[in-house]
Amino acid sequence: MSSTAQSFREIVGIPRSSASTQDSTLIIIDAQNEYATGALKVENVTETRKSIAKLLERYRQAGNGKNIVHVVHKVPEGAAVFTPNTPLAQEFEELTPNTGEKVVTKNFPSSFAKTDLHTYLQGLGDVGKKVVLVGYMAHVCVSTTTRAAAELGYDVLVVGDAVGDRDIPGVKVETLVSVVLSELADGFATVVSEEDIRA
């Protein structure tokens, strides 16, 4: 049953945002093979990676790649997930970065934690002030990055059909993703669909 409650953002007068490939930066979070074939495989990976690939192609057609950021998670040698020097650590092959696209390596859930992402976005000028987030997992790295971006003053959009997750103890994935997106929409971001991001 859906709620008719007003969001916090509505109550304080923050309007919904929108984005195009010309006025925003696409940030692809942890779209790595771990989430397709590893221990952390997400339930909706086929659908979400298609949405991510569509957005990436749209941004590529619109510019020079500077407003495209690939964030990849790195772990110590021998780790059970994202294992270095194995396919699990690699980004989905259809998302392989082109020349001019930024790659950020992170070690924490937030894409901003101990990385140069904030500095890079500031250097882009206006196009770096609005960020469009996609990737995995909704309740960890996507959520944490969204909140950090909002705290840093970015206009944040999360593409709901381009983020994924898995069942966690006590919560099925459908409920988990729905709650995460509702939380983010309430206080930190505008949640949109892939088709809402205009060329």
Swiss-Prot record:
SUPFAM superfamilies: Isochorismatase-like hydrolases
Gene3D superfamilies recorded: Isochorismatase-like
Keyword Secreted part of the UniProt annotation: no
The reaction(s) this protein catalyses: [(1'E)-5'-(3',3'-dimethyloxiran-2'-yl)-3'-hydroxy-3'-methylpent-1'-en-1'-yl]-quinolinone B = yaequinolone C
Keyword Cell inner membrane in annotation: no
Keywords: Hydrolase
Pathway where it operates: Secondary metabolite biosynthesis; Alkaloid biosynthesis; Mycotoxin biosynthesis
EC number(s) reported in the record: 3.-.-.-
Disulfide bridges in this chain: none
Pfam family, one: Isochorismatase
Family: Belongs to the isochorismatase family.
Record-given protein name: Epoxide hydrolase penJ
Organism placement in taxonomy: Eukaryota, Fungi, Dikarya, Ascomycota, Pezizomycotina
